[in-house]
């Protein structure tokens, strides 16, 4: 147990000192473009991995549509949430809860989403954990990535509350941190999402067992600030759809979890989530 704690502390010291914002050093796409547009991503997994997945796609999207993108990955959830609330991103990949919170002010408009890949929250435990059901978590502590993470925190908290299961939340900074904390035995259970667990190394996945899965909901939309001209928004939408038409493009889109992009519509795709009243479980100024 002491060895596990030591390894856990070393891991989080590494994460603490490694965390910093990631920004593309130069334009991704058409470098002759007179305008550049920022693209923000929520730091659900490591910034390095996000950059490796998104930079090639944005380079192609920009080159094919005469656009220049600057990729920005905030250091943590709090910085990301502050950015979207103040309208800093021109374009941003939002979790569905964040889309609810910014659809009116600053007014972010969902442009595209994946057609088939739906999002589920997960509660994971170690593979050898004695826990068999979520009722056994009542009165215990559970790891979550951040207060306002959509599938990994808010959906799980809402559904646990419906079942009269009350837990104390330990926020550890990211989905990746949750999985590692549980695997190392530092946390008995943790909240994540199907889309992020699938990104983890097979060796780590093999150490975990899924205890609970939420119903599926719409995945993250790629959204635009209302200041972006309609002509530019349309270029981005048609660019996504066009890239999906060839094998190399589909591989890029699959890596960013938008394998089959379609036009998104707030009223059709996300307004229904308002009925869940997830704000009861959110923490203002966090995520």
Q: What is the predicted role of each segment?
A:
Residues 2-4, 12, 18-79, 85-87, ...:
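N-terminal hydrophobic or amphipathic helices and topogenic motifs
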Residues 34-44, 116-125, 203-244, 254-279:
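Periplasmic-binding protein-like
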Residues 62-66, 85, 161, 165, ...:
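Sec-exported extracytoplasmic/periplasmic mature domains
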Residues 78-92, 105-106, 135, 176-191, ...:
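Short helices/loops that flank or line small-molecule/ion binding pockets
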Residues 101-105, 200-203:
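Short loop/helix-cap segments at secondary-structure boundaries that form the rim of catalytic
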Residues 106-115, 211:
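A structural signal for short loop-to-beta-strand junctions that line the ligand-binding cleft
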Residues 129, 138-231, 238:
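Pocket-lining segment of extracytoplasmic ligand-binding domains
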């Amino acid at each position: 147990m002491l060895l596990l704690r030591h390894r856990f502390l070393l891991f989080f010291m590494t994460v603490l000192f490694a965390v910093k914002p990631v920004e593309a050093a130069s334009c991704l796409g058409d470098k002759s473009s007179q305008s550049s547009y920022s693209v923000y991503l929520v730091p659900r997994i490591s910034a390095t991995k996000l950059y490796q997945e998104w930079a090639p796609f944005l380079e192609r999207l920009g080159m094919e549509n005469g656009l220049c993108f600057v990729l920005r990955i905030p250091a943590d959830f709090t910085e990301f949430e502050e950015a979207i609330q103040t309208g800093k991103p021109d374009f941003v990949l939002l979790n569905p809860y964040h889309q609810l919170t910014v659809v009116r002010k600053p007014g972010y408009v969902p442009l595209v989403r994946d057609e088939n890949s739906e999002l589920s929250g997960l509660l994971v435990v170690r593979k050898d954990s004695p826990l068999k059901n979520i009722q056994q978590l009542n009165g215990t502590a559970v790891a979550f990535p951040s207060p306002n993470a959509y599938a990994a925190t808010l959906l799980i908290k809402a559904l646990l509350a419906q079942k009269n299961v009350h837990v104390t939340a330990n926020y550890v900074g990211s989905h990746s941190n949750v999985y590692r904390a549980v695997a190392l035995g530092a946390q008995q259970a943790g909240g994540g999402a199907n889309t992020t667990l699938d990104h983890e190394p097979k060796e780590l996945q093999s150490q975990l067992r899924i205890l609970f899965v939420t119903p599926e909901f719409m995945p993250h939309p790629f959204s635009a600030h209302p200041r972006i001209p309609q002509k530019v928004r349309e270029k981005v939408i048609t660019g996504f759809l066009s890239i999906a038409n060839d094998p190399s493009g589909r591989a890029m889109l699959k890596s960013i979890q938008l394998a089959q992009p379609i036009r998104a519509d707030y009223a059709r795709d996300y307004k229904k989530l308002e009925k869940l009243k997830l704000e009861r479980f959110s923490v203002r100024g966090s995520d």
